[in-house]
Swiss-Prot record:
Supports initiation of fatty acid biosynthesis in the absence of FabH. SUPFAM superfamilies: Acyl-CoA N-acyltransferases (Nat), Thioesterase/thiol ester dehydrase-isomerase. Residues 18-162 form the N-acetyltransferase domain. It comes from Escherichia coli (strain K12). GO terms for molecular function: acyltransferase activity, transferring groups other than amino-acyl groups. PANTHER family: GLUCOSAMINE 6-PHOSPHATE N-ACETYLTRANSFERASE, SLL0786 PROTEIN. The gene is fabY. This is Probable acyltransferase FabY.
Length: 329
């Protein structure tokens, strides 16, 4: 079991005999849902089936088992189209409460949310769980209306997600680039496109699975094409900054080859070694043509290669970079 940095030494020691696991097999999923019903719905005299909802198929699920393989805790994270994650169906068996398993589950789900690039995590906490979530940094927004079939008061809890400051090279430029995408290409924000890394040599982007899947639960080709296009565009933009050049970047031609359907968390990688063209033409007031190759992965497995031809038009002197300018820092 991997350690989460926010857990105290005492908590890590108390949960050492337990193991986090994503339910995957049919048997594991059946046990997972049975546990949800027994812990959360059966005490309220609600029928089997009430422990499931329509979002389960697209959500992230976690469970904790002991050394004998007995299921002792569960939790679910669902990410909506507005880059907001919701924790639901979280439960710990009464026999193992106060051992840090609830904290482990909540922090694991929050870590998944952070990796997906969400802006905040919410939960509908039962009245007796409000204090627990408050200790984890969630802020109580007040009581919410619940169905009459749920005779327990619930409260909306919200926690902003701190972004990971792990960009190795020019994180300030990456922040400007991502903000420019969101402002000028609103679809990129709706898709949840996020810059994951820039090293000066490689540029990596990602997006959540949720909202970018097709009916077959693999990634939608249109979303992957858009992600690859922005990734190639972004590396060219960063190269212009590195060389103190400016220019308006236009995609002139592109095609994509799929080796297999892509599933899992996607990311796109553009490398300077897969780029050809002469950007120095811009310094002479002439347009430049750049060929770029972008690899697309799902769960670390390559699935497609995008090849694009971009035209970079000379910038107007001292215009903003987003419009192709060449202003100095």
């Amino acid at each position: 079991m991997s350690q989460l940095p926010g857990l105290s030494r005492e908590t890590r020691e108390s949960i050492a005999m337990y193991h986090l696991r994503v339910p995957q097999t049919e048997e594991e999923l059946e046990r997972y849902y049975q546990f949800r019903w027994e812990m959360l719905r059966k005490p309220l005299h609600q029928p089997k089936g009430s422990e499931r909802d329509a979002w389960d198929a697209m959500a992230h699920h976690q469970m904790v088992v002991d050394e004998q393989g007995n299921l002792v805790a569960v939790g679910r994270l669902y990410i909506n189209a507005d880059n907001e994650a919701s924790i639901r169906f979280m439960a710990v068996h009464p026999d193992v409460q106060d051992k840090g398993l609830g904290t482990l589950m909540a922090m694991t789900l929050e870590s998944v949310a952070r990796q997906e690039g969400v802006k905040r995590v919410t939960c509908s906490a039962r009245e007796d769980a409000v204090e627990f979530f408050a200790k984890l940094g969630f802020v109580n927004q007040g009581e919410i209306t619940t169905p009459t079939t749920t005779p327990i008061r619930h409260f909306l809890m919200i926690k902003p997600v701190a972004t990971l400051d792990d960009i190795l090279h020019r994180g300030d430029w990456c922040a400007q680039l991502q903000q420019a995408w969101y402002e000028h290409i609103p679809l990129s924000e709706k898709m949840g496109v996020r810059i994951q890394q820039y090293t000066g040599q490689k540029f990596i982007t990602t997006m959540p699975e949720t909202g970018n899947q097709n009916p077959h639960h693999t990634l939608f080709a249109g979303s992957l094409f858009s992600l690859a296009t922005l990734t190639g565009w972004g590396l060219i933009w960063l190269m212009l900054r590195e060389r103190h050049l400016g220019g308006t970047i236009i995609l002139a031609d592109a095609h994509i080859r799929y080796s297999k359907p892509i599933s899992g968390k996607p990311h796109a990688v553009a490398d300077l070694g897969a780029l050809s063209g002469d950007l120095d033409r811009l310094a002479r007031g002439r347009k430049a043509r750049v060929q770029m190759q972008v690899e697309i992965f799902g769960d670390e497995t390559p699935g497609a290669v995008f090849e694009g031809t971009y035209i970079v038009l000379p910038a107007k002197p001292f215009g903003p970079y987003e419009e192709g300018g060449n202003e100095e820092e």
